[in-house]
Amino acid sequence: MKMTLIAILTCAAVLVLHTTAAEELEAESQLMEVGMPDTELEAVDEERLFECSVSCEIEREGNKDCKKKKCKGGWKCKFNMCVKV
């Protein structure tokens, strides 16, 4: 009886671990399919940095203090530019 219980619990634990690993692999493969190539991500990063610094320069030329622009999507404002966090 004791051995049967141990065998059932062991099989259940293996099944749970296997299912979790399979779900992680499936999620990773979906991210890889949906994600942008690295070159496109670099272009987006450069574009955001440029937009933030240009908008800050425009505010300065208007004799206003440069307001920290709220950056979104993993970015923060630092030194009047959007910086990837």
From Swiss-Prot:
Under the heading SUPFAM superfamilies, the entry gives: omega toxin-like (SSF57059)
Q: Give the GO molecular function terms.
A: toxin activity
CC per GO annotation: extracellular region; host cell postsynaptic membrane
- Check the record and name the InterPro entries matching this protein: Hwtx-2-like (IPR012625)
Disulphide bridges: C52-C66, C56-C77, C71-C82
Describe the function of this protein.
Answer: Postsynaptic neurotoxin.
Q: Which organism is it from?
A: Cyriopagopus hainanus (Chinese bird spider)
What is the tissue specificity?
A: Expressed by the venom gland.
Keyword field? Disulfide bond, Neurotoxin, Postsynaptic neurotoxin, Secreted, Signal, Toxin
Q: Where is the signal peptide?
A: 1-22
List the propeptide region positions.
Answer: 23-48
Q: Which family does it belong to?
A: Belongs to the neurotoxin 12 (Hwtx-2) family. 02 (Hwtx-2) subfamily.
Which cell locations does it reside in? Secreted
Name of the protein this chain belongs to = U4-theraphotoxin-Hhn1y
